[in-house]
């Protein structure tokens, strides 16, 4: 995980740790001129590791985004940002996207009153995301919300009620709120 961060830069969805400033300088000295292929590969790998996708999953999202009207890159990022695991991470209910995936896989999360155990579930506007009514589920989410440092950085397409452990998807994400810097 730390080798990936050192190579690709900060990936907030993967871990809260940041690469040291000196490690970036060493990589620049060693690398020389970066080819177009290398730049594209690094950007693709950033997407994969940040959102926790396999190569095949990313290809499916690219295919869906290519069929839709509009900029393929923007639509791809919107599709990835509207995944349930990413929305839990953005709401502060999980510290990382892999942590959010674990919450979903262990059936702690309800969407519109139904248990959803698929992290790639595509959320829609007006979806209500809550925790199960069990003490264990609420305790897990409460720990994440209490330790979440980015409470004030909540994107405008999401709202959270930390007392009821409830989040709401207001609309499809705007491109300026996407947390990952991609070329």
UniProtKB/Swiss-Prot annotation:
Report the Gene3D superfamilies cross-referenced here.
Ribosomal Protein S4 Delta 41, Chain A, domain 1, RNA-binding S4 domain
Q: Which InterPro entries match?
A: Ribosomal_uS4, Ribosomal_uS4_bac-type, Ribosomal_uS4_CS, Ribosomal_uS4_N, S4_RNA-bd, S4_RNA-bd_sf
Output the SUPFAM superfamilies linked to this UniProt entry. Answer: Alpha-L RNA-binding motif
Keywords of the record, alphabetical order, are:
Chloroplast, Plastid, Ribonucleoprotein, Ribosomal protein, RNA-binding, rRNA-binding
Q: Name one GO biological process term.
A: translation
Q: Which family does it belong to?
A: Belongs to the universal ribosomal protein uS4 family.
Q: What is this protein called?
A: Small ribosomal subunit protein uS4c
Give the originating organism. Sparaxis sp. (strain Lejeune 1997)
What's the name of its gene?
rps4
């Amino acid at each position: 995980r730390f080798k990936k961060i050192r190579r690709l830069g900060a990936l907030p969805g993967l871990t809260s740790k940041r690469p040291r400033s000196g490690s970036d300088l060493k990589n620049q000295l060693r690398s020389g001129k970066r080819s177009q292929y290398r730049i594209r590969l690094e950007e693709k790998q950033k997407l994969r590791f940040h959102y926790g996708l396999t190569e095949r999953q990313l290809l499916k999202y690219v295919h869906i985004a290519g069929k839709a009207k509009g900029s393929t890159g923007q639509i791809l990022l919107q599709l990835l940002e509207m995944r349930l695991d990413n929305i839990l991470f953005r709401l502060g209910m999980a510290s990382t996207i892999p942590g959010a995936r674990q919450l979903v896989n262990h059936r702690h999360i309800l969407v519109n009153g139904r248990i959803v155990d698929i992290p790639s579930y595509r959320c829609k506007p007006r979806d209500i995301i809550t925790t199960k009514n069990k003490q264990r589920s609420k305790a897990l989410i409460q720990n994440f919300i209490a330790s979440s440092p980015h409470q004030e950085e909540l994107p405008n397409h999401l709202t959270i009620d930390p007392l009821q452990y409830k989040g709401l998807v207001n609309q499809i994400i705007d491109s300026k709120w996407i947390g990952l810097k991609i070329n």
